[in-house]
Amino acid sequence: MASLIQVRDLLALRGRMEATQISQTLNTPQPMINAMLQQLESMGKAVRIQEEPDGCLSGSCKSCPEGKACLREWWALR
C-alpha cells in the first residue's frame, strides 16, 4: 500500500501521470490513489490537468457515444 508521500514523490520524478499509471506503478487500488490525489489537490500540492476536446485526433470527441471517455486526465505537482 502506497503512502501520500510516495504518490507525491512519484509525480515529482515522472512530471505528470494518469491516476491509473500511478495505481499500477505503486501497486495500489485505484480508489485509494484517487483519494490521495484529491487530498494532494486540496492541500495545494497537486493539480489536475484535463485534455481539451480539440486535442482529439479524430475530432469526434464532442459526439463520442462513450461520453468523452477518450479525454485523458493527468496529475502533476504544483
UniProtKB/Swiss-Prot annotation:
SUPFAM superfamilies attached to this UniProt entry: Winged helix' DNA-binding domain
Entry-linked Gene3D superfamilies: Winged helix-like DNA-binding domain superfamily/Winged helix DNA-binding domain
Family label: Belongs to the FeoC family.
GO molecular function (one): iron-sulfur cluster binding
TM spans (from-to): none
Protein name listed in UniProt: Probable [Fe-S]-dependent transcriptional repressor
Role played: May function as a transcriptional regulator that controls feoABC expression.
Pfam families, per the entry: FeoC
Organism: Shigella sonnei (strain Ss046)
Keyword Transcription: yes
Superkingdom: Bacteria
Residues where iron-sulfur cluster binds: C56, C61, C64, C70
InterPro entries in alphabetical order: FeoC, Tscrpt_reg_HTH_FeoC, WH-like_DNA-bd_sf, WH_DNA-bd_sf
Keywords on record: DNA-binding, Iron, Iron-sulfur, Metal-binding, Repressor, Transcription, Transcription regulation
